[in-house]
Amino acid sequence: MTTTQLGLQEQSLWSRFCCWITSTSNRLYIGWFGVLMIPTLLTATTCFIIAFIAAPPVDIDGIREPIAGSLLYGNNIITAAVVPSSNAIGLHFYPIWEAHSLDEWLYNGGPYQLIVFHFLIGIFCYLGRQWELSYRLGMRPWICVAYSAPVAAATATLLIYSIGQGSFSDGLPLGISGTFNFMLVLQAEHNVLMHPFHMLGVAGVFGGALFAAMHGSLVTSSLIRETTEVESQNQGYKFGQEEETYNIVAAHGYFGRLIFQYASFNNSRALHFFLGAWPVVGIWFAALAVCCFAFNLNGFNFNQSILDAQGRPVSTWADVINRANIGFEVMHERNVHNFPLDLASGDAQMVALNAPAIEG
């Protein structure tokens, strides 16, 4: 009898926990994905803050010349970063217990893997939590579909690129100037600007910003006034009101006359789908571009593709970009002292045909 009562009590406690986790009445929805999201994001955030402030230098190239990335080792908020794991580690999973000591783990950049893996798990769970809450509320699932674009971009940059290049040392440094360094190296090694997927990503991000500004300004300019001239028009809106807050017919007429008729949407649902889909698809392509770079499917090479009647190359902007890429690549590997393949793969030039005679 006692065993039965304990079982019922435990079941009741578990049922209450399940109801609390999945309740949409909480101020913040937790959900089953949140059970994993909260500890992983807290772990990633805590480790990032500590490493950004106080992590010792990391031997990123695996040649015993460590790079200092934290604030306490002389960096400022612009130059500080969590330095990627050492090239000596490569793609090996490197948790704390794999190192002989904590000092060794820090020297080889262990915090980078800890932060990246926990962060990725956290944002995956955040995506799942968005779907879960939409499901509980009876909403359509497109919010998590839209969020999949930045999740795909983060996954491609932090994980797929490192896997394709064969080492986490090629990953994105977690800092401001480290991000810029990563971008320059990515351009040098993969000709990012000449890749069509990157071009689509740029069109998605900048186009999305343009369309958002156009939509916001049109709506703000065609609000239905519910207040006097001396009051803010925002006071005329009541949360949850059934009436339209702006005149879509006026906005449609204005924009159709400003450009041409069919450039303007006459369906509010189609308009907002377009506003959501354009940047999402663009960022999907940007993530695909990074996945291509990971496996060295680089941008187009149009170097010296135009020749004059004598066969001499006529320089284009593609050649200008190529010269910049070579310069970036020469500066990239600080202590390896290797020439970029563009310079090292040419035919050997004879500098002396006859050795001078040495009089003994």
Swiss-Prot record:
It is found in: Cellular thylakoid membrane. It comes from the Bacteria. It catalyses: 2 a plastoquinone + 4 hnu + 2 H2O = 2 a plastoquinol + O2. It is a multi-pass membrane protein. It is an enzyme of class 1 (oxidoreductase). The record marks 190 as: Stabilizes free radical intermediate. Fe cation binds at residues 215, 272. SUPFAM superfamilies: Bacterial photosystem II reaction centre, L and M subunits. The keyword Calcium applies. The D1/D2 heterodimer binds P680, chlorophylls that are the primary electron donor of PSII, and subsequent electron acceptors. It shares a non-heme iron and each subunit binds pheophytin, quinone, additional chlorophylls, carotenoids and lipids. D1 provides most of the ligands for the Mn4-Ca-O5 cluster of the oxygen-evolving complex (OEC). There is also a Cl(-1) ion associated with D1 and D2, which is required for oxygen evolution. The PSII complex binds additional chlorophylls, carotenoids and specific lipids. GO terms for molecular function: chlorophyll binding; electron transporter, transferring electrons within the cyclic electron transport pathway of photosynthesis activity; iron ion binding; oxidoreductase activity, acting on diphenols and related substances as donors, oxygen as acceptor; oxygen evolving activity. Pfam families: Photo_RC. Chlorophyll a ChlzD1 binds at residue 118. Chlorophyll a PD1 binds at residue 198. GO terms for biological process: photosynthetic electron transport in photosystem II; response to herbicide. A quinone binds at residues 215, 264-265. C-terminally processed by CtpA; processing is essential to allow assembly of the oxygen-evolving complex and photosynthetic growth. Pheophytin a binds at residue 126. Its EC number is 1.10.3.9. The chain crosses the membrane at residues 29-46, 118-133, 142-156, 197-218, 274-288. Photosystem II (PSII) is a light-driven water:plastoquinone oxidoreductase that uses light energy to abstract electrons from H(2)O, generating O(2) and a proton gradient subsequently used for ATP formation. It consists of a core antenna complex that captures photons, and an electron transfer chain that converts photonic excitation into a charge separation. The D1/D2 (PsbA/PsbD) reaction center heterodimer binds P680, the primary electron donor of PSII as well as several subsequent electron acceptors. Cyanobacteria usually contain more than 2 copies of the psbA gene. PSII is composed of 1 copy each of membrane proteins PsbA, PsbB, PsbC, PsbD, PsbE, PsbF, PsbH, PsbI, PsbJ, PsbK, PsbL, PsbM, PsbT, PsbX, PsbY, PsbZ, Psb30/Ycf12, peripheral proteins PsbO, CyanoQ (PsbQ), PsbU, PsbV and a large number of cofactors. It forms dimeric complexes. Belongs to the reaction center PufL/M/PsbA/D family. This is Photosystem II protein D1 1. It comes from Synechocystis sp. (strain ATCC 27184 / PCC 6803 / Kazusa). The lineage of its organism: Bacteria, Bacillati, Cyanobacteriota, Cyanophyceae, Synechococcales.
